């Protein structure tokens, strides 16, 4: 059994980002940055509660805000997932691949990704109902799902889930800790950037546009980095023959 090394995984993630940035940067721009900026500029404006609003009014306002934002958030999530799959394909393809082939592969995988999303949502939901600890554990055990299906060209989502479970055996908590620490760092930085750009101006102003560009650029960079982290986790745990060494 390979013991997961967080430091080595982080170094490998940085190597992946630097080595392939000209190609993956374009994909990150198309699938991470553009959908994000489109949602920010074309999506519904934030709803502001009236002065002296009651808790019920605020709750109603929040639900309405969520309802309006949901289609945009769904579109951004779909685009981000497609982009991640295409980037993973470029990084993990056994015989090398082109950007066009990687994009085609990502679109072919849409049915598989939909089923994966539903199954994982159900599993995480059940785990969260039991206790938060099982849900955190599943983060580590399913971290290799998307790199696995991308590398091995798996169309069966259940094969990807079981493959990730086997691959991360004995390392679930280490991987979960690594991913959670990484996500906390991204969340803190995102909140800081958002707080700074939030003072640029209200929705519809020129300052808001500049702030949205900055926020979307940061989100795109983090999306690329998150994809690299998943790839690095998989690269460290996957075992290949001598003729199939990762480049």
What are these regions (language model features)?
Residues 1-247:
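Hydrophobic alpha-helical membrane segments
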């Amino acid at each position: 059994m390979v013991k997961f090394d967080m430091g080595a995984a982080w170094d490998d993630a940085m190597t992946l980002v630097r080595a392939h940035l000209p190609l993956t940067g374009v994909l990150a721009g198309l699938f991470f940055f553009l959908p994000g900026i489109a949602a920010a500029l074309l999506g519904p404006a934030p709803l502001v509660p009236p002065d002296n609003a009651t808790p019920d009014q605020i709750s109603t306002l929040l639900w309405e805000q969520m309802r309006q934002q949901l289609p945009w958030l769904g579109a951004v999530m779909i685009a981000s997932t497609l982009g991640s799959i295409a980037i993973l394909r470029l990084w993990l393809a056994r015989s090398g691949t082109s950007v066009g082939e990687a994009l085609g592969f990502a679109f072919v995988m849409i049915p598989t990704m939909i089923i994966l999303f539903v199954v994982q949502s159900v599993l995480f939901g059940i785990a969260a109902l039991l206790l938060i600890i099982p849900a955190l554990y599943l983060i580590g055990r399913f971290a290799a799902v998307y790199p696995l299906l991308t590398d091995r060209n798996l169309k069966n989502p259940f094969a990807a889930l079981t493959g990730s479970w086997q691959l991360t055996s004995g390392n679930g908590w280490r991987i979960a800790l690594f991913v959670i620490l990484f996500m906390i760092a991204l969340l803190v930085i995102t909140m800081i950037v958002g707080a700074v750009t939030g003072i640029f101006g209200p929705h519809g102003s020129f300052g808001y546009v500049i702030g949205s560009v900055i926020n979307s650029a940061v989100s795109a960079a983090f999306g690329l980095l998150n994809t690299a982290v998943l790839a690095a986790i998989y690269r460290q745990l996957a075992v290949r023959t001598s003729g199939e060494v990762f480049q």
